[in-house]
Curated annotation (Swiss-Prot):
Its main location: cytoplasm. This is 3-phosphoshikimate 1-carboxyvinyltransferase. Pathway: Metabolic intermediate biosynthesis; chorismate biosynthesis. One of its GO terms (biological process) is amino acid biosynthetic process. 3-phosphoshikimate binds at residues 27-28, 32, 166-168, 192, 305, 332. Belongs to the EPSP synthase family. Disulfide bonds: none annotated. Its EC number is 2.5.1.19. The lineage of its organism: Archaea, Thermoproteota, Thermoprotei, Desulfurococcales, Desulfurococcaceae.
Amino acid sequence: MVWLRAPDRVVVHPSTVEGRVEAPPSKSYTHRMLFLALLARGRSVVRRPLVSNDTLATLNAVALLGGKPRLGRGVAEVEGGEVRGGAVVYAAGSGTTIRIAMGVAAHSAEATLLYGDESLNRRPVHPLSEALRSMGARVCDTGGNPPVKVSGPLRRASVEVDAAISSQFATSLLIAGSRLGEFELSAARLSSRGYVDITLESLSMFGVRVEREGYRLFRLRGTPKPVDAAVPGDYSSASFMLAAGAIAGRVEVEGLRPVDPQPDRRIVELLRSMGARVRVEGGVVAVESTGPLEPVDVDLDGSPDLAPVAAVLAAYARGVSRLRGLERLKYKESDRLSAIAWNLARLGVEARVRGGILEIRGGGVEGGVARSWGDHRIAMAMAVAGLGARRPVAVEGFSRVPDSYPGFLEDLARLGARVEAVKGGGV
Protein backbone atom coordinates (compact mmCIF):
# COMPACT_ATOMS: atom_id res chain seq x y z
CA MET A 1 0.00 0.00 0.00
CA VAL A 2 1.44 3.39 -1.02
CA TRP A 3 0.29 6.24 1.20
CA LEU A 4 -0.03 9.86 0.10
CA ARG A 5 2.46 12.21 1.72
CA ALA A 6 2.58 15.84 2.80
CA PRO A 7 5.13 18.09 4.52
CA ASP A 8 5.67 17.67 8.24
CA ARG A 9 5.65 21.42 8.87
CA VAL A 10 3.82 24.22 7.08
CA VAL A 11 4.08 27.96 7.67
CA VAL A 12 1.12 30.12 6.63
CA HIS A 13 1.77 33.85 6.29
CA PRO A 14 -0.93 36.51 6.62
CA SER A 15 -2.51 36.62 3.17
CA THR A 16 -5.40 37.87 1.10
CA VAL A 17 -7.17 35.07 -0.74
CA GLU A 18 -9.33 35.25 -3.85
CA GLY A 19 -10.46 32.79 -6.50
CA ARG A 20 -12.31 29.57 -7.17
CA VAL A 21 -11.47 25.96 -6.29
CA GLU A 22 -13.33 22.70 -6.77
CA ALA A 23 -14.63 20.83 -3.74
CA PRO A 24 -12.87 17.49 -3.24
CA PRO A 25 -15.12 14.43 -3.60
CA SER A 26 -16.90 13.44 -0.41
CA LYS A 27 -14.94 11.14 1.85
CA SER A 28 -18.12 9.87 3.53
CA TYR A 29 -19.79 8.88 0.25
CA THR A 30 -16.59 7.34 -1.15
CA HIS A 31 -16.22 5.00 1.85
CA ARG A 32 -19.82 3.84 1.70
CA MET A 33 -19.98 3.41 -2.06
CA LEU A 34 -16.79 1.32 -2.18
CA PHE A 35 -18.00 -1.07 0.53
CA LEU A 36 -21.44 -1.37 -1.07
CA ALA A 37 -19.75 -2.12 -4.39
CA LEU A 38 -18.01 -5.04 -2.65
CA LEU A 39 -21.39 -6.39 -1.49
CA ALA A 40 -23.08 -5.95 -4.90
CA ARG A 41 -22.76 -8.93 -7.25
CA GLY A 42 -21.14 -7.60 -10.41
CA ARG A 43 -19.08 -4.61 -11.54
CA SER A 44 -19.73 -1.19 -10.04
CA VAL A 45 -18.25 2.05 -11.33
CA VAL A 46 -17.69 4.79 -8.75
CA ARG A 47 -16.87 8.02 -10.56
CA ARG A 48 -14.89 10.85 -9.03
CA PRO A 49 -13.98 8.99 -5.83
CA LEU A 50 -11.91 10.77 -3.23
CA VAL A 51 -8.34 9.48 -3.34
CA SER A 52 -6.98 10.13 0.15
CA ASN A 53 -5.24 8.01 2.75
CA ASP A 54 -8.52 7.20 4.50
CA THR A 55 -10.26 6.11 1.29
CA LEU A 56 -7.17 4.22 0.13
CA ALA A 57 -7.46 2.29 3.41
CA THR A 58 -11.04 1.43 2.43
CA LEU A 59 -10.00 0.43 -1.10
CA ASN A 60 -7.36 -1.85 0.44
CA ALA A 61 -9.95 -3.34 2.83
CA VAL A 62 -12.33 -3.98 -0.08
CA ALA A 63 -9.58 -5.89 -1.89
CA LEU A 64 -8.63 -7.94 1.18
CA LEU A 65 -12.28 -8.79 1.88
CA GLY A 66 -12.83 -10.30 -1.56
CA GLY A 67 -13.56 -7.40 -3.90
CA LYS A 68 -11.57 -6.74 -7.05
CA PRO A 69 -11.02 -2.99 -7.15
CA ARG A 70 -9.22 -1.03 -9.84
CA LEU A 71 -8.42 2.63 -9.36
CA GLY A 72 -8.05 4.71 -12.51
CA ARG A 73 -7.99 8.41 -13.27
CA GLY A 74 -11.17 9.81 -11.77
CA VAL A 75 -12.85 6.42 -11.43
CA ALA A 76 -12.84 3.31 -9.23
CA GLU A 77 -14.21 0.02 -10.53
CA VAL A 78 -15.07 -2.77 -8.12
CA GLU A 79 -16.04 -6.33 -9.01
CA GLY A 80 -18.04 -7.47 -5.99
CA GLY A 81 -20.25 -10.25 -4.77
CA GLU A 82 -18.15 -12.49 -2.54
CA VAL A 83 -16.94 -11.57 0.94
CA ARG A 84 -13.76 -13.41 1.84
CA GLY A 85 -12.29 -13.58 5.33
CA GLY A 86 -8.93 -14.78 6.55
CA ALA A 87 -7.23 -11.43 5.93
CA VAL A 88 -5.39 -8.90 8.07
CA VAL A 89 -6.83 -5.45 7.36
CA TYR A 90 -4.87 -2.33 8.30
CA ALA A 91 -7.17 0.71 8.39
CA ALA A 92 -4.45 3.29 9.15
CA GLY A 93 -6.26 6.17 10.92
CA SER A 94 -9.69 5.70 9.35
CA GLY A 95 -12.47 5.01 11.82
CA THR A 96 -15.03 4.70 9.02
CA THR A 97 -12.92 2.04 7.31
CA ILE A 98 -12.45 -0.20 10.31
CA ARG A 99 -16.02 0.09 11.58
CA ILE A 100 -17.72 -0.61 8.24
CA ALA A 101 -15.20 -3.38 7.52
CA MET A 102 -16.10 -5.07 10.81
CA GLY A 103 -19.70 -5.47 9.66
CA VAL A 104 -18.73 -6.60 6.17
CA ALA A 105 -16.18 -9.12 7.52
CA ALA A 106 -18.96 -10.76 9.56
CA HIS A 107 -20.33 -12.22 6.30
CA SER A 108 -17.42 -14.68 6.15
CA ALA A 109 -16.91 -17.73 8.36
CA GLU A 110 -13.16 -17.12 8.18
CA ALA A 111 -11.82 -14.73 10.81
CA THR A 112 -10.55 -11.31 9.75
CA LEU A 113 -8.18 -9.27 11.93
CA LEU A 114 -8.67 -5.51 11.72
CA TYR A 115 -6.44 -2.86 13.28
CA GLY A 116 -5.17 0.66 12.74
CA ASP A 117 -2.52 3.12 13.77
CA GLU A 118 -2.03 4.24 17.37
CA SER A 119 -4.83 6.82 17.25
CA LEU A 120 -7.34 4.45 15.64
CA ASN A 121 -6.57 1.68 18.12
CA ARG A 122 -7.72 4.06 20.88
CA ARG A 123 -11.13 4.66 19.29
CA PRO A 124 -14.05 2.60 20.65
CA VAL A 125 -15.82 -0.18 18.74
CA HIS A 126 -17.43 -2.00 21.68
CA PRO A 127 -21.10 -1.13 20.91
CA LEU A 128 -20.60 -2.37 17.35
CA SER A 129 -18.90 -5.54 18.60
CA GLU A 130 -21.87 -6.25 20.87
CA ALA A 131 -24.39 -5.69 18.07
CA LEU A 132 -22.54 -8.00 15.68
CA ARG A 133 -22.33 -10.68 18.37
CA SER A 134 -26.10 -10.48 18.86
CA MET A 135 -26.46 -11.14 15.11
CA GLY A 136 -24.39 -14.33 15.40
CA ALA A 137 -20.88 -13.10 14.60
CA ARG A 138 -17.84 -13.93 16.68
CA VAL A 139 -16.09 -10.71 17.67
CA CYS A 140 -13.03 -10.32 19.86
CA ASP A 141 -11.90 -6.74 20.42
CA THR A 142 -9.17 -5.32 22.65
CA GLY A 143 -10.78 -3.80 25.70
CA GLY A 144 -13.53 -2.41 23.49
CA ASN A 145 -11.09 -1.00 20.93
CA PRO A 146 -9.15 -2.34 17.92
CA PRO A 147 -7.39 -4.60 17.13
CA VAL A 148 -10.52 -6.70 16.60
CA LYS A 149 -11.08 -10.15 15.12
CA VAL A 150 -14.40 -10.82 13.35
CA SER A 151 -15.95 -13.93 11.80
CA GLY A 152 -19.47 -14.83 10.72
CA PRO A 153 -21.86 -15.70 9.46
CA LEU A 154 -24.64 -13.31 10.43
CA ARG A 155 -27.73 -15.32 11.37
CA ARG A 156 -30.09 -12.68 12.75
CA ALA A 157 -31.60 -9.97 10.54
CA SER A 158 -32.53 -7.52 13.29
CA VAL A 159 -30.38 -5.79 15.88
CA GLU A 160 -30.21 -2.90 18.33
CA VAL A 161 -27.20 -0.64 18.77
CA ASP A 162 -26.29 2.22 21.08
CA ALA A 163 -24.97 4.86 18.67
CA ALA A 164 -24.31 7.65 21.18
CA ILE A 165 -20.55 7.52 20.67
CA SER A 166 -20.60 7.29 16.88
CA SER A 167 -23.14 7.07 14.07
CA GLN A 168 -20.59 4.85 12.30
CA PHE A 169 -21.87 1.93 14.38
CA ALA A 170 -25.30 2.32 12.76
CA THR A 171 -23.73 2.82 9.32
CA SER A 172 -21.69 -0.38 9.65
CA LEU A 173 -24.75 -2.42 10.62
CA LEU A 174 -26.91 -0.94 7.85
CA ILE A 175 -24.31 -1.70 5.18
CA ALA A 176 -23.67 -5.21 6.52
CA GLY A 177 -27.40 -5.82 6.96
CA SER A 178 -28.14 -4.84 3.36
CA ARG A 179 -26.59 -8.13 2.23
CA LEU A 180 -29.22 -10.13 4.14
CA GLY A 181 -32.16 -9.20 1.90
CA GLU A 182 -34.29 -8.02 4.81
CA PHE A 183 -32.88 -6.21 7.82
CA GLU A 184 -34.10 -4.11 10.72
CA LEU A 185 -31.97 -1.80 12.88
CA SER A 186 -33.05 -0.10 16.08
CA ALA A 187 -30.63 2.71 16.93
CA ALA A 188 -30.59 4.24 20.41
CA ARG A 189 -29.20 7.73 21.09
CA LEU A 190 -28.12 8.16 17.47
CA SER A 191 -25.50 10.88 17.10
CA SER A 192 -24.55 12.86 13.96
CA ARG A 193 -27.74 11.82 12.18
CA GLY A 194 -26.72 13.42 8.89
CA TYR A 195 -24.08 10.75 8.40
CA VAL A 196 -26.77 8.07 8.62
CA ASP A 197 -28.69 10.04 5.98
CA ILE A 198 -25.60 9.71 3.76
CA THR A 199 -25.62 5.95 4.41
CA LEU A 200 -29.32 5.67 3.54
CA GLU A 201 -28.85 7.65 0.32
CA SER A 202 -25.92 5.39 -0.61
CA LEU A 203 -28.01 2.27 0.05
CA SER A 204 -30.81 3.64 -2.14
CA MET A 205 -28.28 4.42 -4.85
CA PHE A 206 -27.36 0.70 -4.85
CA GLY A 207 -31.00 -0.37 -5.14
CA VAL A 208 -31.75 -1.18 -1.49
CA ARG A 209 -35.22 -0.07 -0.39
CA VAL A 210 -35.14 1.94 2.82
CA GLU A 211 -37.98 2.52 5.28
CA ARG A 212 -37.56 4.43 8.51
CA GLU A 213 -39.34 5.69 11.58
CA GLY A 214 -37.47 8.88 12.33
CA TYR A 215 -33.93 8.10 13.42
CA ARG A 216 -34.89 5.24 15.71
CA LEU A 217 -35.94 2.36 13.43
CA PHE A 218 -34.63 1.47 9.96
CA ARG A 219 -35.85 -1.32 7.67
CA LEU A 220 -34.04 -2.49 4.54
CA ARG A 221 -35.42 -4.60 1.69
CA GLY A 222 -33.40 -6.08 -1.16
CA THR A 223 -29.66 -6.42 -1.63
CA PRO A 224 -27.10 -4.05 -3.21
CA LYS A 225 -26.98 -4.03 -7.02
CA PRO A 226 -24.05 -2.77 -9.12
CA VAL A 227 -24.11 0.93 -9.97
CA ASP A 228 -22.44 3.52 -12.17
CA ALA A 229 -22.58 6.62 -9.99
CA ALA A 230 -20.55 9.71 -9.08
CA VAL A 231 -19.43 10.92 -5.66
CA PRO A 232 -20.71 14.40 -4.74
CA GLY A 233 -18.50 17.22 -3.48
CA ASP A 234 -17.42 17.30 0.17
CA TYR A 235 -18.76 20.06 2.41
CA SER A 236 -16.37 18.98 5.20
CA SER A 237 -13.28 19.74 3.15
CA ALA A 238 -14.88 22.73 1.43
CA SER A 239 -15.54 24.32 4.84
CA PHE A 240 -11.85 25.20 5.19
CA MET A 241 -11.74 27.12 1.91
CA LEU A 242 -15.07 28.82 2.64
CA ALA A 243 -13.74 29.88 6.06
CA ALA A 244 -10.63 31.25 4.35
CA GLY A 245 -12.88 33.53 2.32
CA ALA A 246 -14.72 34.73 5.43
CA ILE A 247 -11.44 35.55 7.17
CA ALA A 248 -9.18 36.84 4.42
CA GLY A 249 -10.86 37.70 1.13
CA ARG A 250 -13.27 36.09 -1.29
CA VAL A 251 -13.49 32.38 -2.19
CA GLU A 252 -15.78 30.35 -4.43
CA VAL A 253 -16.04 26.57 -4.10
CA GLU A 254 -17.71 24.69 -6.94
CA GLY A 255 -19.05 21.14 -7.07
CA LEU A 256 -21.28 21.34 -3.97
CA ARG A 257 -24.90 20.16 -4.18
CA PRO A 258 -27.30 22.85 -2.89
CA VAL A 259 -29.49 20.12 -1.36
CA ASP A 260 -27.34 17.56 0.41
CA PRO A 261 -27.63 15.50 3.62
CA GLN A 262 -23.99 16.10 4.57
CA PRO A 263 -23.97 17.51 8.13
CA ASP A 264 -21.17 19.93 7.30
CA ARG A 265 -23.34 21.74 4.77
CA ARG A 266 -24.18 23.70 7.90
CA ILE A 267 -21.01 25.73 7.28
CA VAL A 268 -23.08 27.88 4.88
CA GLU A 269 -25.59 28.77 7.61
CA LEU A 270 -22.80 29.30 10.16
CA LEU A 271 -20.89 31.74 7.94
CA ARG A 272 -24.06 33.73 7.26
CA SER A 273 -24.86 33.93 10.97
CA MET A 274 -21.36 35.26 11.64
CA GLY A 275 -21.79 38.08 9.14
CA ALA A 276 -19.82 36.85 6.13
CA ARG A 277 -21.32 37.56 2.70
CA VAL A 278 -22.51 34.19 1.34
CA ARG A 279 -23.98 33.41 -2.07
CA VAL A 280 -25.18 29.98 -3.26
CA GLU A 281 -25.84 29.54 -6.97
CA GLY A 282 -26.27 26.07 -8.40
CA GLY A 283 -23.25 24.06 -7.34
CA VAL A 284 -21.13 27.07 -6.31
CA VAL A 285 -20.84 28.55 -2.82
CA ALA A 286 -19.15 31.96 -2.63
CA VAL A 287 -18.00 33.54 0.64
CA GLU A 288 -16.60 37.03 1.09
CA SER A 289 -15.15 38.73 4.16
CA THR A 290 -17.03 41.78 5.44
CA GLY A 291 -14.62 42.57 8.27
CA PRO A 292 -14.61 41.17 11.81
CA LEU A 293 -17.07 38.32 12.25
CA GLU A 294 -19.93 38.20 14.75
CA PRO A 295 -19.81 35.77 17.70
CA VAL A 296 -22.17 32.80 17.78
CA ASP A 297 -23.72 30.42 20.29
CA VAL A 298 -24.20 27.22 18.31
CA ASP A 299 -24.73 23.50 18.95
CA LEU A 300 -22.47 21.36 16.75
CA ASP A 301 -23.53 17.95 18.05
CA GLY A 302 -24.91 17.01 14.63
CA SER A 303 -21.87 18.27 12.71
CA PRO A 304 -18.85 17.68 14.97
CA ASP A 305 -16.32 17.79 12.12
CA LEU A 306 -17.06 21.52 11.79
CA ALA A 307 -15.74 22.21 15.29
CA PRO A 308 -12.09 22.96 14.34
CA VAL A 309 -12.94 25.41 11.56
CA ALA A 310 -15.83 26.92 13.57
CA ALA A 311 -13.40 27.55 16.42
CA VAL A 312 -11.04 29.39 14.08
CA LEU A 313 -13.91 31.51 12.77
CA ALA A 314 -14.85 32.31 16.38
CA ALA A 315 -11.29 33.47 17.00
CA TYR A 316 -11.88 36.17 14.38
CA ALA A 317 -15.22 37.27 15.88
CA ARG A 318 -15.58 40.36 18.05
CA GLY A 319 -16.87 38.85 21.27
CA VAL A 320 -17.38 35.52 23.01
CA SER A 321 -18.59 32.52 21.01
CA ARG A 322 -19.84 29.28 22.50
CA LEU A 323 -19.61 26.02 20.57
CA ARG A 324 -21.80 23.40 22.23
CA GLY A 325 -22.42 19.67 21.88
CA LEU A 326 -18.74 18.77 21.57
CA GLU A 327 -18.54 15.92 24.11
CA ARG A 328 -17.86 13.27 21.44
CA LEU A 329 -14.84 15.09 20.03
CA LYS A 330 -12.61 13.16 22.41
CA TYR A 331 -13.35 10.03 20.32
CA LYS A 332 -12.01 11.52 17.07
CA GLU A 333 -8.52 11.19 15.55
CA SER A 334 -7.30 13.19 18.53
CA ASP A 335 -8.99 14.47 21.66
CA ARG A 336 -10.19 17.14 19.26
CA LEU A 337 -11.78 19.43 21.84
CA SER A 338 -8.62 19.67 23.94
CA ALA A 339 -6.49 20.01 20.79
CA ILE A 340 -8.55 22.97 19.54
CA ALA A 341 -8.36 24.82 22.86
CA TRP A 342 -4.63 24.10 23.24
CA ASN A 343 -3.85 25.42 19.76
CA LEU A 344 -5.94 28.56 20.09
CA ALA A 345 -4.11 29.40 23.31
CA ARG A 346 -0.78 28.89 21.54
CA LEU A 347 -1.90 31.34 18.86
CA GLY A 348 -2.92 34.03 21.35
CA VAL A 349 -6.66 33.34 21.52
CA GLU A 350 -8.46 32.92 24.84
CA ALA A 351 -10.31 29.60 24.84
CA ARG A 352 -11.86 27.60 27.65
CA VAL A 353 -13.44 24.12 27.75
CA ARG A 354 -16.41 23.63 30.07
CA GLY A 355 -17.76 20.10 29.71
CA GLY A 356 -18.83 19.78 26.09
CA ILE A 357 -18.76 23.55 25.52
CA LEU A 358 -15.88 25.51 24.01
CA GLU A 359 -15.89 29.22 24.85
CA ILE A 360 -13.74 31.43 22.62
CA ARG A 361 -13.08 35.13 23.14
CA GLY A 362 -12.44 36.47 19.67
CA GLY A 363 -10.51 39.48 18.52
CA GLY A 364 -8.08 37.96 16.08
CA VAL A 365 -5.13 35.58 16.00
CA GLU A 366 -1.64 36.65 17.05
CA GLY A 367 0.28 33.83 15.36
CA GLY A 368 2.78 31.27 16.59
CA VAL A 369 3.23 27.51 16.42
CA ALA A 370 0.28 25.13 16.31
CA ARG A 371 0.28 21.34 16.47
CA SER A 372 -1.99 18.90 14.64
CA TRP A 373 -1.96 16.23 17.35
CA GLY A 374 -2.08 13.72 14.48
CA ASP A 375 -5.45 15.09 13.30
CA HIS A 376 -5.96 16.23 9.70
CA ARG A 377 -8.83 18.59 10.53
CA ILE A 378 -6.88 20.30 13.30
CA ALA A 379 -3.95 20.80 10.91
CA MET A 380 -6.12 22.38 8.20
CA ALA A 381 -8.02 24.59 10.65
CA MET A 382 -4.80 25.97 12.11
CA ALA A 383 -3.46 26.65 8.62
CA VAL A 384 -6.59 28.69 7.84
CA ALA A 385 -6.11 30.52 11.15
CA GLY A 386 -2.82 31.85 9.81
CA LEU A 387 -4.41 33.73 6.91
CA GLY A 388 -5.64 36.66 8.99
CA ALA A 389 -3.12 36.46 11.82
CA ARG A 390 -0.85 39.31 12.89
CA ARG A 391 2.20 37.14 12.25
CA PRO A 392 2.76 33.74 10.60
CA VAL A 393 1.32 30.49 11.93
CA ALA A 394 3.45 27.34 11.74
CA VAL A 395 1.58 24.03 11.82
CA GLU A 396 3.56 21.01 13.02
CA GLY A 397 2.38 17.50 12.17
CA PHE A 398 0.81 18.62 8.91
CA SER A 399 1.56 15.25 7.32
CA ARG A 400 -1.88 13.86 8.27
CA VAL A 401 -3.74 16.21 5.91
CA PRO A 402 -3.78 13.65 3.01
CA ASP A 403 -6.06 11.51 5.21
CA SER A 404 -8.94 13.61 3.84
CA TYR A 405 -7.77 16.49 1.59
CA PRO A 406 -4.53 15.76 -0.30
CA GLY A 407 -4.88 18.92 -2.42
CA PHE A 408 -5.37 21.29 0.51
CA LEU A 409 -2.05 23.14 0.22
CA GLU A 410 -2.32 23.44 -3.55
CA ASP A 411 -5.85 24.85 -3.30
CA LEU A 412 -4.80 27.32 -0.61
CA ALA A 413 -1.88 28.50 -2.75
CA ARG A 414 -4.15 28.73 -5.81
CA LEU A 415 -6.25 31.22 -3.87
CA GLY A 416 -3.18 33.36 -3.22
CA ALA A 417 -2.16 32.25 0.26
CA ARG A 418 1.53 32.55 1.10
CA VAL A 419 2.53 29.10 2.30
CA GLU A 420 5.93 27.57 3.05
CA ALA A 421 6.24 23.80 3.28
CA VAL A 422 9.06 21.85 4.90
CA LYS A 423 9.45 18.58 3.00
CA GLY A 424 10.05 15.18 4.52
CA GLY A 425 8.33 12.56 6.62
CA GLY A 426 4.93 11.15 5.85
CA VAL A 427 1.84 9.56 7.18
